[in-house]
Amino acid sequence: MYSEKGTHSIEVCFSPLSWPLYEKPNALVIVTDIFRASTAICAAFHNEVKSIIPVAEISESEAYKQKGYIVAGERDGKNLDCADFGNSPFNFLDPALKGKTVVMNTTNGTQAIKAASQAGNQVIIGAFINLSAVCRFAMEQEKDVLVFCAGWKNRFSMEDSLFAGATVEQLVVASKGKFHTTCDSAVAAADLWLMAKGNLLGYIEKAAHRHRLKKMCLDDVLEFCLTFDFTSALPVLENGKLVDQRTLK
């Protein structure tokens, strides 16, 4: 997948700890947290929520709750005391959320979103369930691309890295020379993806977070999180809130 040919580069950041090393203020940043935050966010916009406010601190969630907001949040898989529900994608498909604003706070995903937002980049949210929409948008932007894996408590995450690899493959191959990569982490993610894509659900059995979810009886979402193109929703960060890019046209 290593390629020096192409107008724009694509890189992969495997961990929030490495994020400060990827200073590219003009790049499009794709934040992903497959199990489960980014999948839940994409599902929410498929369900036509109005917006999502990502926050990093529990105190922020508590303050929004006191103001009457719907709050979704978890730490280590356990719902926050102030939360109406956690971060299962199925929670966000509740028809009652249509047209509503939800405040979201998670162990990994919203932390990465906040970090990306502070760098001043254009930020979108990616998951397998909106992979084609993400890649199509990226190809339209005429920018370098950086896939930011939320990981697990600053550690490498297999599922996020697989999504990164799928994105690298689509942008380098499908764009027919528009993108190139000389980034080792992008090449490694693409190689991991090439090994796994024939049986993604089977391959993910090796992932540590898959087993964390199983121990907490939260693995009912596994297959959904690995479903391709369930939605064409494209969450974008605008003035501190996530909105569906389709509604901005």
Predicted features by range, described:
Residues L28-A40:
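Active/ligand-binding-proximal structured segments within catalytic/core domains
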Residues A150-D160:
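Phosphate/ribose-phosphate-bearing ligand recognition and processing surfaces
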Residues D84-Q122, R136, Q141, M158-K249:
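Long, charged alpha-helical interface segments
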Residues V12-E23, A37-V49, V55, S59-V102, ...:
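Residues that scaffold, gate, or flank divalent-cation-dependent active/transport sites
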Residues F128, A133-C135:
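Active-site C-terminal subdomain of aminotransferase-like
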